[in-house]
Amino acid sequence: MVTRMTETPEKLLSDPREGPDRHERDDSADLARNTISLPSSLAGSSTLDRLVETARNYARAAASDSTLKAYAKDWAHFARWCRLRGADPLPASPQLIGLYIADLAAPSGKAPALSVPSIERRLSGLTWGYAQRGDRLDRKDRHIASVLAGIRRKHGRPPAQKEAILPEDLLDMLATLPHDLRGLRDRAILLIGFAGGLRRSEIVGIDHRKDDTPDSGGWVEIMEDGALITLRGKTGWREVEIARGSSDQTCPVHALSQWLHYAKIDFGPLFVAVSRNGLKATSERLSDKHVARLIKQTVENAGLRPELSKADRQRLFSGHSLRAGLASSAEVDERYV
């Protein structure tokens, strides 16, 4: 049974004199610096002091900057929610968290209700926030788990199925690309993404070589019979072999080689932005949003699924369509791609 709490009067929720407290600061940088330290009994060891900074760097690399910023915002939002209701976010209280996520799903004020994935993301942020403060949030506690299960059952919606891009669709999409530097890059993105069954974040995270950049998600090796892409995943490293195609027009390895040659890329991110005049490649890594936009635009230009409205095509096709296309073509479960 979820413990009932007395809410603060409504006027308190909009009282501008109530300033943020110490829990609401975006202190992700401070927490990252202070997470790893030496025991007091070993203080003063120069060798271990150097290792502390190395360990801190690895700790910071455990999550991307954008993820850490999102988690910090999640914590600040929860801390403010607590303050406006006369509660303290510390120590971790499953009862309080249960009430918080219930309010996110069915807010009493003007704030919009959050979707189930957004609420789950908030919980991940709070779990991180408590861990950085030396506390632990048990998401399996019944006060949280039962409320979340009810939210999923009442408000959850099945994920929209994305349309798979089949080989014949891909050929039509490739035919719409211009014969310039951007076209070479985008052709390589589509072919490598399809042949490797890669997620859009994996495509743009690849570097030319191992350890080229700190934010690398992997690297590529081009060989005589194909290419080998090594990717960093949530559970470790995995290798993706990409064979050469039967013709240059559809060969992902040839497309990648052409892009690297004309873009003069021999170090750093594999797929980068092109200058405004379209004549040279920059050093700026592409966002994964570029892959989604590229797919939507080439699908539209190729006239795929003409019986659908433009809005429906935009909704059905996304970065996931490349991965789904390989799974459909190979007749395998997408989980094993």
Residue spans for each PLM region:
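Extended, non-catalytic subsegments within catalytic or DNA/protein-binding/adaptor domains
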Residues: 1-336
